[in-house]
């Protein structure tokens, strides 16, 4: 086998890529593949002896790559178009900074040399996904009472994101007396959850008897996606019972029972007159 030598002044092989970086989409359902092109530049002063080039492409941080053609035979100086296929891992973090390297060796007669390698920075494209749920999406309270919901947001994207909240039917609920405090923005790291408590107040008005289910329509919006990614979620409150402002519910119930009792006695007395 010929002894390996450095590329001499009479023959050289270099790789030149057409771009120094490439963006790869790793979101769910994507191919996670990107293509770049370049040339394999071969120079020799001895066109009588073929230059045989073997190329390979490698990646870091779980990224793989292939180069085509991987073998080249040139008689004299030449420039051969090459294509590099890059495949990233699905759902990779945007923080990843993989590098793809195209390198190889060449032979010309008894001489063996290293191909002048080239590198390309792989940029992981961010994607944004939200999941929201509550451990208590349905709460039953007495009219006039408050309710506290436990909300859990999960950042399912591959980049840190900030979320803002909107109540789609806020006008309708506030118009009948509900108090719905604004929910502060949340910033959550990728693939991480965050829990928050949200208190609402049912209408403070006279209610002799009520048994009604109210729906609060929440919308969570990803700010880093410029509002393109959003998630709807509904919470439910059943107000059941009576409410007279300034009185304890138990006392109100006793008062109503007393009034009902007096009315029944009055009617009974009227029948015997």
Describe the residue ranges of each PLM region.
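Long beta-sheet-rich domains in secretory-pathway and surface-associated proteins
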Residues: 1-273
């Amino acid at each position: 086998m010929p002894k390996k030598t450095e590329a001499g002044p009479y023959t050289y092989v270099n790789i030149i890529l057409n771009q120094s970086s490439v963006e790869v989409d790793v979101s769910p359902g994507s191919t996670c593949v990107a293509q770049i092109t370049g040339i394999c530049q071969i120079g020799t002063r001895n066109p009588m002896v073929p230059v045989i080039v073997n190329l390979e492409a490698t990646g870091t941080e779980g990224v793989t790559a292939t180069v085509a053609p991987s073998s080249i035979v040139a008689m004299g100086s030449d420039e051969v178009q090459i294509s590099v296929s890059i495949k990233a891992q699905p759902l990779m973090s945007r923080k990843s900074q993989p590098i793809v390297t195209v390198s190889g060796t060449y032979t010309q007669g008894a001489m063996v040399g290293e191909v002048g390698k080239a590198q390309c920075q792989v940029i992981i494209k961010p994607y944004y996904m939200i999941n929201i749920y509550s451990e208590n999406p349905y709460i039953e309270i007495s009219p006039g009472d408050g309710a506290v919901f436990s909300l859990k947001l999960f950042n399912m994207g591959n980049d840190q994101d900030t979320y803002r909240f909107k109540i789609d039917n806020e006008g309708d609920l506030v118009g009948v007396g509900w108090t719905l405090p604004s929910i502060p923005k949340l910033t959550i790291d990728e693939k991480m959850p965050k829990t928050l408590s949200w208190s609402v107040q049912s209408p403070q008005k006279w209610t002799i008897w009520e048994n009604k289910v109210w729906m609060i329509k929440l919308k969570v919006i990803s700010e880093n996606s410029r509002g393109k990614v959003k998630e709807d979620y509904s919470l439910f409150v059943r107000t059941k019972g009576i409410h007279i402002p300034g009185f304890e519910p138990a006392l109100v119930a006793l008062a109503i029972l007393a009034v009902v009792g007096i009315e029944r006695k009055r009617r009974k007395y009227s029948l015997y007159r």
